Design a protein with these regions (language model features):
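Conserved class I S-adenosyl-L-methionine
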Residues: 1-45, 59, 63, 83, 143-168, ...
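Class I SAM-dependent methyltransferase SAM/SAH-binding core
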Residues: 51, 57-104
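A conserved beta-strand element that flanks and buttresses the S-adenosyl-L-methionine
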Residues: 116
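Short catalytic micro-motifs in class I SAM-dependent methyltransferases
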Residues: 119-122
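A short glycine-rich, Lys/Arg-flanked "PGG" loop and its adjoining helix->strand segment in the class I
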Residues: 128-140
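Acceptor-substrate binding/catalytic loop of class I
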Residues: 163-180
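A C-terminal cap/extension of S-adenosyl-L-methionine-dependent methyltransferases
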Residues: 193-240
Length: 240
């Protein structure tokens, strides 16, 4: 990808890493909170054509399909797409998966009612082309739900430390504030409807257990310390 680090080029990231993360206590809690927020923002998807950009191993795509959406998932990583296809087969889900990059979506204009993009921009230095492509494939009135790693949180600080210590994964990481995400969406021609936060605890199991019950309430009132930032936006309807 131009100006980016495709997931397939990063040896630290793959289906097994995702599975290990979800199997941990803090990973399961974090996935639950992030997933609940994204699904709340996505809302009713019954009959909608949905594109999941950076679908990973297909977990969100399959949940959207289960809720009645017609789902296509793309990812830059062939191993991730293979894992997503296996997951779909295991669950007898009718979801289309293919290898593609977010900067060059292989779809006609105005193809989708909803686009989801979860934690992909953290591996993209120049995110503007991604937003432009998403705007292009959305139909007028279509919606974008994007979730990203927060820039100012205990989690982000830990990732920066790991980058300084030599992590190949986080040395290529790019974190953005809610304001920066809002600006990218608006410059692409989208109208931002809201920004919410999640994951207000540090990467420590006890803290997660103590704070996670209050996480949804915190996400409605402040972005300070959010480890996960979710933005919803809409493509303006065509004029008369």
């Amino acid at each position: 990808m131009k100006n980016s680090a495709p997931a397939c080029d990063i040896p630290d990231l793959g289906p097994d890493v995702y599975a290990q993360w979800r199997a941990s206590g803090i990973g399961a809690t974090t996935e639950r909170l992030e997933g609940r927020l994204i699904l709340e923002l996505v809302g009713d998807v019954s009959g909608c054509r949905v594109l999941d950009v950076g679908c990973g191993d297909g977990r969100l795509a399959l949940e959207l399909s289960r809720r009645g959406a017609i789902v296509t998932g793309i990812d830059a990583s062939a191993p991730m797409i293979d894992a997503a296809k296996r997951r779909a087969q295991q669950h007898n889900a009718n979801v289309t998966f293919q290898v593609a990059v977010a900067e060059h979506l292989p779809f006609p204009a105005e193809q989708f009612d909803i686009v989801t993009a979860i934690t992909i921009l953290c591996f993209v230095q120049d995110a503007a082309p991604v937003f432009r492509e998403i705007e292009r494939v959305l139909r007028p009135g279509g919606r974008l739900i994007i979730g990203e790693l927060g820039k100012w949180s205990a989690w982000a600080a830990g990732r920066r430390i790991r980058a300084w210590l030599g992590s190949r994964l986080w040395r290529r990481g790019w974190f953005r504030t809610a304001k920066e995400l809002r600006g990218l969406a608006e410059r692409a021609g989208l109208v931002v409807k809201g920004v919410r936060g999640a994951v207000y605890y540090p990467r420590w199991g006890l803290a997660a257990r103590l704070i996670s019950p209050f996480d949804p309430a915190l996400g409605r009132f402040t972005m300070i310390g959010a480890g996960f930032v979710a933005l919803s936006a809409v493509k303006p309807a065509a004029g008369p």
